[in-house]
């Protein structure tokens, strides 16, 4: 029997009676957001919408994005990263479990000094990948050009946000690089390891 999303009581300010809302909606009201799956258009759009809404509602209260993601699509992930930079509140990023591939890119996008990993979390970085189409040669060339542009963008972001030199990041992105939370801190991807 599936459990589903639990319901919790929530009372709006000024109301006497609490209503029952699902757990995630209750946490959203506290500005606690979750990325707990592959990065795709649907989840990215949902989180971006929440970030913008919460920013409009109160641009002074920080937002907290908890990440446990194996990665996913590059374009939706870059869109989420850009939204984090755009909204006026600081966005804290917290790695719980795994932040791999696009998950680590979103993790590094948190407000500098406000990026955290739990002690047993794992972080993995690598270059963007593509399943090259079996189409015509011209399509292959266009796709590979776009992939190189994306790699350059991702590399620049890691360089800027980690403080590591370009050659270190470029070398790291050549393969899958797994890190413990302290290693991710030493690498500049997170600022703190929770205790």
Curated annotation (Swiss-Prot):
The active site is at residues 101, 126. GO terms for biological process: proteolysis. Its EC number is 3.4.21.92. Its main location: plastid. The keyword Thylakoid does not apply. It catalyses: Hydrolysis of proteins to small peptides in the presence of ATP and magnesium. alpha-casein is the usual test substrate. In the absence of ATP, only oligopeptides shorter than five residues are hydrolyzed (such as succinyl-Leu-Tyr-|-NHMec, and Leu-Tyr-Leu-|-Tyr-Trp, in which cleavage of the -Tyr-|-Leu- and -Tyr-|-Trp bonds also occurs). It is found in: Plastid, Chloroplast stroma. One of its GO terms (cellular component) is chloroplast stroma. It comes from the Eukaryota. SUPFAM superfamilies: ClpP/crotonase (SSF52096). GO terms for molecular function: ATP-dependent peptidase activity; serine-type endopeptidase activity. Pfam families: CLP_protease (PF00574). Component of the chloroplastic Clp protease core complex. Belongs to the peptidase S14 family. Cleaves peptides in various proteins in a process that requires ATP hydrolysis. Has a chymotrypsin-like activity. Plays a major role in the degradation of misfolded proteins. This is ATP-dependent Clp protease proteolytic subunit. The gene is clpP.
């Amino acid at each position: 029997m599936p459990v589903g999303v639990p319901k919790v009581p929530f009372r709006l300010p000024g109301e006497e009676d609490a209503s029952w809302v699902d757990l995630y909606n209750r946490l959203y009201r506290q500005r606690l957001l979750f990325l707990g799956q592959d990065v795709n258009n649907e989840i990215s759009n949902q989180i971006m919408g929440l970030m913008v809404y919460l920013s409009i509602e109160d641009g002074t209260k920080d937002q907290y994005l908890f990440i446990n993601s194996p990665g996913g699509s590059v374009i939706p992930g870059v869109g989420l990263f850009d939204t984090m930079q755009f909204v006026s509140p600081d966005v804290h990023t917290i790695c719980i479990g795994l932040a791999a591939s696009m998950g680590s890119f979103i993790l590094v996008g948190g407000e500098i000094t406000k990026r955290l990993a739990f002690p047993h979390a794992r972080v993995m970085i690598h270059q963007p990948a593509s399943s090259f189409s079996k189409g015509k040669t011209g399509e292959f060339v266009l796709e590979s050009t776009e992939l190189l542009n994306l790699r350059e963008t991702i590399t620049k972001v890691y360089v800027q946000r980690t403080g590591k030199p370009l050659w270190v990041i470029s070398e790291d992105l050549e393969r899958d690089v797994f890190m413990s939370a302290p290693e991710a801190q030493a690498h500049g991807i997170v600022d703190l390891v929770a205790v």
